[in-house]
Amino acid sequence: RYQSNWSAFFDPIAARLVIDEGHLSADVSIMPLIANSDYRQIIETTGTVKLDPNAGDPHEESLVHWITALDMKSRTMQQAGNMAALFAPSLGLNAFGWVGQWMSVYADESPFWDEFGKAVAKDGEDGAEEFMKDNVGRLPLALNVEATNPFKLTAFLAALRAWVEQTAPGMTTWTNHEYKKQGYVKIAPAGDILEDLEDEGVEEIALYYAPSSKLLTVTLNEELLKRSLDRRLEARKLKREKKPLPKNPKPWLGKSASITVNSKLISFFDVFSRDEMTKQFRRRSWNNLPILNEWKLNLGKDDALAYHTKTWHVLLICPGGGEYVWNEKFQTYESTVFGHPGGPKTPKNPASLLKGFKRLDFGLTFEHDGLRAKGTAWKRLPNASN
């Protein structure tokens, strides 16, 4: 009855917002979700699987870490397996039979980000694009997939290699490596691909993967892979000593999907969004000028802002935090922050949405035919070391 009467308008929503000195948090529940919800595809992927608190290989040095639950029995995941088998028959009909209940993607702390930040600060988006083009092989980004069957994982990797070498012979070189008695594989370009990359000035690039009985890690950064292997060794050591594993330093807010982002990547986002936000704020600020000029020039109201407020019960505010003042030379109102179209000003402090935050956490949980979303923004407190 609810869906037939109200589905075109809204879902039933309950929300709680908490604001204190250290953080802002929101907890939103939507129950039930309508049948044609935009979240339906995500729900079909995660199914009834719930994330374990320590799933995803959580670790302190991650700058951003995203994780999602996987229901390998769901129609979506079954279709993914069938598509893989269609394109690469050697993988078999049950290509992803080794996959467990989650996958995650993370980026770790690295000098790469400091260099990237300098390129962004110097040349903005163009600098970022050029830097990524030249240094993609150093990108400290990794993919983790939980493995439940090491034998099926081994068969999958062997079939994948055979398919690659059959479809693109001589284009890749596969070599086995070892780190602290832990094996991993390096896939490097060869032949024409290698020559083309060298001609374009791209530094060495390779793909690395390390399988284990419980996890498959794939990355472009060998150092990142070694860190992952170190964590595996530490976990095995604790297990042998019958000691508990360390708790997730950045707990997942959702049991179906979660993401956590720290201050360094937040600052990058701020840089990329700053120009666009400033343009939007300037445009909104200038949108108020025509009516103020109308009151001033045609109706003779010396305090056009006060007249507008009294007449329409709406206070016109400059989104940049400035004031509206009369410019006698140009015969127009202007913002003390953005100026006016005939004499624009550059804000001393560009618009910044997330500048005051050191970490952002967000999570989704699908339960009881509905959705629960949690989000927390951790503030950067004065005199705080981090």
Model-derived features with residue positions:
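Signature of soluble extracytoplasmic/periplasmic domains of secreted precursors
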Residues: 1-386
